[in-house]
Every structure is written in structure tokens, then in C-alpha cells.
Amino acid sequence: MTEAIIIDGKEFSSNLRNKIAEDVKAFKKERNVVPGLAVVLVGEDPASRIYVRKKEEMTTAVGMNSLSYRLDANASQQELLDLIETLNHDPAVHGILVQLPLPKHIDTPTILEAIDPDKDVDGFHVVNAGRLAIGTPSLVPCTPAGCMMLLEHSLGSLKGKNALVIGRSTIVGRPMAQLLLAADCTVTVAHRHTKNLEELCRQADIVVAAVGIPHFVKASWLKPGAVVIDVGINRVPAEDEAAKAAGKTRIVGDVDFVEAAKVASAITPVPGGVGPMTIACLLNNTVQAARNLTSAS
């Protein structure tokens, strides 16, 4: 049996960042403007700090301005709203990202809706969600955008494909379904409570797993030759007994990768698949936002 092609998100995202760097260079020459991405971090969550640092490094690497804002964990919601309002009106800022999760005393939807939709490079604002739903050009959530790039790279045209999205979050599942519809797929959205999930999987040419449960999707569910995009990032105990006893962990996806790779024609690994694409698409959105904002001014 032929093993699946491993879809290398690291390599693809590296090539995409190189292209973005060229776009930034051309944009600077054309409009004499440097795209600026403002990243706001509230508190000292260790994982968030790592993500923010990666975003800052990659923003600078492609030639854009990286603007960092740090608020204390007990900063008030109004303080954060005031900062966002300032960034909304700052002409040097073309993209605004508020790192999630936020402290419990801050209402996340209120914060996300306060960001100027034209600077909402995460694509989470209700205006951008609405634009996506009706097929109007918009800033698209980064993870689904990255998934689409990987699918189109693997399959070429997606027209007429049966696509199953397992997961219904506003960050991945729902926008993913909208993007697949726009690409002329026949789309089914399922979740952990869907009764005939295995049957739906066996009919799908494309399976996007974004349910947040380790190894939820089994190889036996898959249609032979399906393309599998695993969005899951789940931390589980290390396989090695000594490492497990020491409390060490490893990252796995929502798909049983080893067995699924024996059935699928192509599959993303975890880590190294979808994850690297998310930051690259964030940078891509920032350049797009800068173009939109400067052309409108």
C-alpha cells in the first residue's frame, strides 16, 4: 500500500513568506509605506508569549514594522479598548492582532468587535465574517486561509470535491466551510456530536479535522485517496515511559496520523503542517490590509 504524500507546511510557509517579503519590498517602492502589524498581549501567559515572539520575528523578517504592546494581566477592559481605539486611528498601523486567550475579566467578543474591520488581520470581526459569508473580498481567518492554500497546492482545482469539515468554531470550522463553498466544493459541516460521522468521512474527498480531540479521526473512517488536513493541536503525555513519568508531553493532531497516512493520498502532519501556515497568512493579511487602507486614503 502506498503511503500518503506528507503535506509540508513548513516548506510551503517558508516559500510564502519569501513571496510576502517581495510583496512588501514592491509595496514600499510603490507607495512609500511600510506595512505595520500591532500585536497586543495582555498578561504573561507563557504559550502566548512564545506565539507573540514568533509573530514579531517573522513580521520583521519580511520587512514589515512590528509594533508590540504589553498590558498587565489585571489591566481593565477599558484600558484595552482605549489602546485598540488608538491603534485604529494610527496610520502607521495596518493590522491589529490581540493575542488570545484574554484574562477572564475581559470579554473577548467585545474586544474583537472593537478592532477596525479593515485592520482585523485575524479575520475574526463580525464584518469580515459577514463579508466572507456573502462572498465579498475580506480579511479571512488565517488558519482556514492556510488550509486552503495547502489543499489547492495538493489538488489543484477543488471544484466538485466532497469536503467534510469536522468542527464548527468561528475561528476555523465555519470560515473553512465558507472557503470550500467558494471553491465550488460540496461541503458538509460536522462535529463531535454528529451521529453518522464515520459514514460522512467515507464519502469525503477532503477531510478537515478541527475538533480539538487527540486522534479523533480514525483511518478506518477515511475514503481511500482522501486528502486530510489536520488542524488539531493537542498536548498529550509523552510516549516514552521515563519522559511520561517526568511529566513531559508531545503534540498530536485530531487525526490518527500513522494509520491515516496508509489510507489518504495526502495528509498534513502535526506539528509541521497547518501550524506554520497560520503566521504566514497573518503576514499576508497584513500586506493586504495595508494595500486596502492606503488605496482608500
UniProtKB/Swiss-Prot annotation:
GO terms for biological process: L-histidine biosynthetic process; methionine biosynthetic process; purine nucleotide biosynthetic process; tetrahydrofolate interconversion. Keywords: Amino-acid biosynthesis, Histidine biosynthesis, Hydrolase, Methionine biosynthesis, Multifunctional enzyme, NADP, One-carbon metabolism, Oxidoreductase, Purine biosynthesis. InterPro entries: Aminoacid_DH-like_N_sf (IPR046346), NAD(P)-bd_dom_sf (IPR036291), THF_DH/CycHdrlase (IPR000672), THF_DH/CycHdrlase_cat_dom (IPR020630), THF_DH/CycHdrlase_CS (IPR020867), THF_DH/CycHdrlase_NAD-bd_dom (IPR020631). NADP(+) binds at G167, R168, S169, I233. Pfam families: THF_DHG_CYH, THF_DHG_CYH_C. Coiled coil: none annotated. Its EC number is 1.5.1.5, 3.5.4.9. The keyword Aminoacyl-tRNA synthetase does not apply. One of its GO terms (molecular function) is methylenetetrahydrofolate dehydrogenase (NADP+) activity. It catalyses: (6R)-5,10-methylene-5,6,7,8-tetrahydrofolate + NADP(+) = (6R)-5,10-methenyltetrahydrofolate + NADPH; (6R)-5,10-methenyltetrahydrofolate + H2O = (6R)-10-formyltetrahydrofolate + H(+). GO terms for cellular component: cytosol. Belongs to the tetrahydrofolate dehydrogenase/cyclohydrolase family. Catalyzes the oxidation of 5,10-methylenetetrahydrofolate to 5,10-methenyltetrahydrofolate and then the hydrolysis of 5,10-methenyltetrahydrofolate to 10-formyltetrahydrofolate. HAMAP family: THF_DHG_CYH. This is Bifunctional protein FolD. It comes from Zymomonas mobilis subsp. mobilis (strain ATCC 31821 / ZM4 / CP4).
